[in-house]
Amino acid sequence: GVGLNCPHTPGISIDRPGIGVYSRSRTLTSGAVFSNLYNNAWGTNFTEWIEGSHAAKFYVWSYKNYSAPAALVTPAEETRTPLSAAYYAPTGLSFAYNYETSGELPDTQPGLMLDRKGVLVTSFNEHGNEAMIRLWEEAGSSGKCTVTLPRHSSFKVAYPCNLRGERTANAAGIPISNNSFDFEIGPNQPRTFLLK
């Protein structure tokens, strides 16, 4: 099979041009993929009023055996959010905030980990003694997921929340033991937790 990711032009159609047309039962007749460069249905001629050149990236890859996490989710996410790192060294400059640095940092240190492929961490924000974590199942399969937090985390309970970050009424917190917790996630479902 073939995987396709168009991060600059997410509006695509297969077999014939056009966006906004959906069918669960259509039989594909060709391998033609049309990408809507301007991501609209009105055919605005942007080149008439936006100067310069236009470019878009397309990533195409093949796979031998289909598995949504390995064939689609992981390769697409790697093209959208490539690995990045940051290095901090105090500068002594008056306009820069110089964080307290003492001791040595390890050469490597594991961060947040999930026990299954196809579930993405879409946000992890710490605020004082709390943190909000959002996970999204993208492979279309339900089941248990285990989150392992960074080594020195002090969180004890994960409370289910809605997409606004508000605790779900009557939902009991999930105990965090050995820096990890388990929860059930449905196909293509987002799950948000407040860690305390």
Residue map of PLM features:
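C-terminal (or distal) subdomains of carbohydrate-active enzymes
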Residues: 1-196
